[in-house]
Amino acid sequence: HPTASATTHVWECKITAEKKLNEFRKIKARDGSKATLRQWNFVYWVQAQLYMLYGGYTRHWCVVASAGCRDWDACRTELMRDEAEFYAERLRDMVDQVDELPARVSESANAFACKWCDFRSICHEGAPVEKNCRTCRHARPVEGPQWHCTLHDELLSPDKQAVGCDQQSLREVLA
C-alpha cells in the first residue's frame, strides 16, 4: 500500500486496451481525478470501495495502463463509507440467500454485460448448472469462506466442494 504525504492508499493497477485508456483520460480531464474511476468503470469503483472499507483505508490509487505498460495514467478515489457498506451488505445478502438467484443484469442475452458474463449460457440459454457442493441443496455457507454439508454433517474443503458427491441434489432455484 503506497503512502502519500499524509494518507496511506490502497494501490491497484488495471491493464486495458488503448481505447479504454483514452476514455479514462477523457473522463479524468472532464470530471477530475476523484470522480474518474466511478465514471470509467463502476465495477472497479465498487471493488475499490470494498478494498478501502475492509482494509481500513480512506484512499485508493488506481493506475490504468496500456498493454505492456507502455502508457499509463492514474486517479485517486476516496472512500464513500455509506456506499461501500451498501455494496458489502448486498454481497453478504447474496451469500446468505444461496437459495435465491440474483436479478438478471438484463433480460437480453445481447446486452453488453451479458455478452461477457461467464453465466450467460445458464442465465439466457438454459444450459445445465454445474453439479458440485455449491449448487447442492445440502450445502450452506458458514463463517468466512467455508461451506458445510448438512447431509454428511461436515465442513467442505475447496477440493471436496468442486467434486461433490453421488448424493448431490440441485438447489430448487437451479433445477
Q: What are the residue ranges of the model-derived segments?
A:
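Metal-dependent nuclease catalytic regions and adjoining charged, substrate-binding loops involved
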Residues: 23-31, 35-45, 50-153, 161-175
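BZIP DNA-binding basic region
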Residues: 20
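Active-site beta-strand-loop-beta-strand hairpin of nuclease catalytic cores
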Residues: 1-17
